[in-house]
Amino acid sequence: MNINLDSAKDTFCKNVLIYGYCKYENKGCAFSHTVKPTSSVPGSQGSNATTNSSGNTNADMKKKFNFNTPSFQPSTVPNLTNKFSNLSPNLKEIPVFVPSGGMSNADSGGMNEPEMNDSVTPNKKFNASTPSFMPSNPYISNNDQISAPSPVMAQSVSTPGAKANGNIQHNPYLPGNAGTPQPTSAVAAPNSADVFFQQPTSSYPLQHHLYAPAPPPRLTIPLPPHEINVNSMFIPNDLRETLLKRNEATLQTLPRSNLPDHVNIYHSLVPIDTSFENISKVYELPSFVYKVFSNVDGNPYALRKIDIQSVLRITNELPFKYIKKWKSVKCANIVQLQEAFTSMAFGGSYSSLIVTYDYFPNSNTLQEQHISRRLGGKLEPITEELLWNYVIEITNALINIHENNLAARSALHLSKILVTNKNRVRLGGVGISDILNYEDDEEQIQQKGLDAFRHELQQADIKKFGKLILDLAALCLPNNARNHEPKDLISLLKTSTTVNFSGEFINLLTELNMNTSDLQEFNRNHLSRRILNFCSNAQDSQDFMESQLSTELENARVFRLITKLNFIIDRPEYDNDPNWQENGNKYIIKLFRDYIFFQYDEFGKPVCDLSRVLTNLNKLDAGIDEKFLLVNKDEKNCIIVSYKEIRDIIDSAFRTLTRG
């Protein structure tokens, strides 16, 4: 491409037009990269009034808007001509808008005729002499009425009289509504002096990263055995973040909701069910789950409300006769049932069935974990090792249930089994089927006998268990291959090239779905060897948690020491105390505080070394005899002192303070 260098220097570079910059600007690009200013030059205030008329005409023709252009006056319509005949084409005669109520008449009168220079006004883009808009006071008016809403009233304003009618109906299940309820709004009544601004309670973001996270393993610098970094002094970031989120979920509240304030001994109801289904597919009745707090012990619980309506009329204690048995079942893989009762607290013409369980914050169901993704979550892939863990844990739960002459029944469903921790599942919703099906169960017991009926229910549990594990394993197959009979699904899992299940696991699926009638025998034949691996992993997890707990064990000791320092330093009553002056014996405490937190490096930047702070505080708390140098801020005075001497001075000052 041939470029004329003489003409190219006056041509604007297209790279700047297209991309905003030219990467060859300083590397030999021949085109121009200088952006020409497009702003017009305003006329000078001291310009000569006798300017050439032709020059003014040309300047006015180049302008897009000309203030000297007269207003449009139609002459063909008589009525409109008379209406607009009084308008003046001169800008200085146009009245200035002054809002009513913004200022007194005396003040606004002087603004109606601002002084303007004819030679200056047409060239100004913005007229500085135009008065600024002053909104009217919403509380003061000549006629004691609010003629127009003020911009201030656009905020969330409510009055005591309108607060009850200002509640906005909102869906408590939508994310963000639980922590951020919609603010109420109402129009302020005339002559009302009690208007106040109601701030909505919004959920604040959790400060998970209180310190810098650990770098990826591939970027981690190997350290000698005698060196450690800051991250090794605290629990891992993922574990800390998980615990913080659980704590936040436990303490979450929902103010100004339509839910009842109290249900029996429980209060502070917060919806935690994320299924968005009013009718439960398991119970075939409206069912909702809430997090509540107990008035008795103050602990959080999960409250399930079932609208039994006319399906079941509970008039006595007979439907709850198995609740006492369920409360006695203690198993690590079962969500503990607390109590069951009926209540009219939710309104309506029928009472609701209320069943409360232990609460596990931020727990997912197996359906949310692997099938239907929860809002903001990710689906966990199915692996053979994960399924072995599920089989062992659910088998443990079923054995405990069957030994107490009970049956899991509706609890063996993907939407009722909770994943409370990594590879940790618990059967939830136990005991509800015994209440809802009480009348039918009594008829079956009279026909078959109690033992035969219980044995039948327990065999149904085993079949549901096998079907549940098979459905989870079938998630590894394509969608069109999952809707088959159990025998066909097992054959597909065995012959599929995309699934790598071992023969041992295929035999387990076959035995569980075809032949098993006794869980104890199934446990001995198929799970005995796998249980040893499960116990080993559980003990490794226990050792990990214990090691993390040991790293946090001494945090309270350091916190108490920092609290003492802040109690005694910079108190107002010590301003004139000679002991806290530069020559006083307690001035060392201030120097030690500066030595720990107010250090600067050789470049004048603050030193924020957490390991150094912890090291010095640990030495101070231990009271060792190590001596070091303390220097004041102007570096004119210095003192050599030991940690033991400083600790004694701090203890003495704190005792003096507490004695008062």
UniProtKB/Swiss-Prot annotation:
One of its GO terms (cellular component) is P-body. The N-terminal zinc finger binds to poly(A) RNA. Contains a pseudokinase domain. The protein kinase domain is predicted to be catalytically inactive because some of the residues important for catalytic activity are substituted and it lacks the equivalent of the binding site for a peptide substrate. However, it has retained an ATP-binding site and ATP-binding is required for mRNA degradation, stimulating the activity of the PAN2 nuclease in vitro. Residues 150-159 have a biased composition (Polar residues). GO terms for biological process: mRNA processing; nuclear-transcribed mRNA poly(A) tail shortening. A zinc finger (C3H1-type) spans 7-36. Belongs to the protein kinase superfamily. PAN3 family. Residues 36-60, 150-186 are annotated as: Disordered. Keywords: ATP-binding, Coiled coil, Cytoplasm, Metal-binding, mRNA processing, Nucleotide-binding, Zinc, Zinc-finger. It is found in: Cytoplasm. It comes from Debaryomyces hansenii (strain ATCC 36239 / CBS 767 / BCRC 21394 / JCM 1990 / NBRC 0083 / IGC 2968). This is PAN2-PAN3 deadenylation complex subunit PAN3. Residues 43-59 have a biased composition (Low complexity). Residues 252-528 are annotated as: Pseudokinase domain. Homodimer. Forms a heterotrimer with a catalytic subunit PAN2 to form the poly(A)-nuclease (PAN) deadenylation complex. Interacts (via PAM-2 motif) with poly(A)-binding protein PAB1 (via PABC domain), conferring substrate specificity of the enzyme complex. The keyword Transmembrane does not apply. Residues 568-660 are annotated as: Knob domain. ATP binds at residues 304, 358-365, 415-416. Pfam families: Pan3_PK (PF18101). A motif (PABPC-interacting motif-2 (PAM-2)) lies at residues 59-79. PANTHER family: DEADENYLATION COMPLEX SUBUNIT PAN3, PAN2-PAN3 DEADENYLATION COMPLEX SUBUNIT PAN3.
